Amino acid sequence: MEELKLLGNRASPFSYRVLWALKHKGVKYEYVEEDLFNMSELLLRCNPIHKQIPVLVHAGKPLPESIIILEYIEDTWPQNPLLPLDPHERTMARFWIKFGEDKAPIFYKFFHTVGEEQVKGTKEAEELLKTIEEYGLGDQEFFGGEELGLTDIAYGWIACWLDVLAEAAGVEMLGPQSFPRLQAWAERFKQLPLIKDNLPDRHKMLTFFKSRREKIIAPAATT
């Protein structure tokens, strides 16, 4: 079997995207935990451009960026497909994945700001959630229909990380009254054995992100 390594971090939703996809495919791999603030020589050598995790190393060849890695996994290991066979449905899945990636910075604005800027950032994130709920998910069980797909994995951080980020920032996000369908999807997603058995400890995540936020907003608090 060709060597397969995943360089990631247990606090990173992007690392978990890759981890979930590999486990869904039943592919064996070696996981290498990376320190986000003291990156290894291996990581810097494998991803010299962005110097970020995750990186998948397959047969000595590194691949950066979680969404690109997901596409590679789908192409390389066709068993248990995560993308639809229908060309239109397949393309729309890719559309919503790209949409989420393009808009991702909006979700982090409320976490990185305070005061009026945080209020504004929270509203912008809620508007984006409405768009995803109405036009991306709709009335489906999952983004691709009745079964887990690549779009669900790409948006999995909303189900498993967004509430942690919101609590760390002292705001409310993804409430069942405001987003009933998206909240229901998030609960279904988290209850899947694949996801449920492969999640970081929530308390540790909350502690980590509270610490990160304090460091991020510290300059704003002193001006």
Segments and roles (model prediction):
Residues 129, 177-193:
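Short, mixed-charge aromatic SLiMs
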Residues 106-110, 161-169, 195:
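Amphipathic C-terminal alpha-helical segment
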Residues 134-146, 168-169, 192-199:
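Surface-exposed helix-capping loop/turn segments at secondary-structure junctions
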Residues 25, 46, 168-172, 193:
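Residues at alpha-helix termini
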Residues 145-169, 177-183:
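GST superfamily/GST-like fold recognition
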Residues 1-147, 180, 214-217, 222-223:
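GST-like domain detector, emphasizing the conserved glutathione-binding G-site
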Residues 192-223:
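Long, charge-rich low-complexity segments
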Residues 83, 172-176:
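Membrane interface segments of multi-pass transport proteins and intramembrane proteases
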